[in-house]
Amino acid sequence: HMAWDHHGNRLRYCRSLQPFSLELSDEMPMTGQHESSVTYPEFYRMPDGQLLFFYRDGSSGNGNLIINSYNSADKKWTGIQDNLISGEGKRNAYWQACVDLNGAIHISWVWRESPDVASNHDLCYAVSKDGGRTWEKSTGEKYRIPVTQNSAEIICSIPQRSELINQTSMYVDGKGKILIAAYWKGLGNLPQYQLVYHTGKQWKQADLAFRKTTFSLSGQGTKKIPVSRPQVIAW
C-alpha cells in the first residue's frame, strides 16, 4: 500500500498487484469520502493483521482526523472514523499514534488555532482498545465522538506561544506505559526537550533542561530552527 505527495492535496493511493510485488495498481480512491484535502497520511498494522490509514482532512488550523480500515479479504477500505478529532472549523489536532503489543491504539496531539505555529497549545490523549471504533481517556472515561477541544483529556497544559512543536514522538511499552517526547519552553524560558509519561497511575513531566539556545516558532510555513523533533527508540 502506498500513499504519497500529500499536503492539502487529493488522496493519491495505490497498492501492489500481488503481495510483496513492486508492480503497482493505478491510483484509486479508498472510500471516496473526505479525500480532497489529505495531509500526514500514515499506515498502521494491527497485531491481528488489520491495516489502518490515518490522515488529516482539511488544513493547518482547520482540520479533522480520519481513520480508514482495510479488509484484505474483499480488498476494500471502509471508514471507521470520519471525524475522530474535530477542529470544529476553528483549529486542528497535530497528532501522533502508536499501536501497542495488545493492539490498543494510542493517540496524543497538540491543538493549533491558526496557520501560525505559535498557536500550538496543550498535549492531549486518547486510546482505543477495539481497533479505533470507540475511544477513551487514560482514566477509562469514554469519549463522545468527535473529540473536541472542550472534551479532550489534557495530559500536559501548555499555553500558546510556548514554542511547542507539533507532531511529537510516542511509544508504549509491553506493560502499557506511555512515553511522549516533544519540546516547548521549559527551564530558563528556553525551548527544551520534554518527556511526558504515564506511571500507571498518573501523568508526569520531565524537563531535560540541557539546551542553551533560544529560537521562535512564530509565523507560518516551514521553520529554520536549530533542533529536530525528538524520536523515541526502545529495545
Kindly give the residue locations of the regions a language model identified.
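Extracellular, repeat-based ectodomains that mediate carbohydrate processing or recognition
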Residues: 1-235
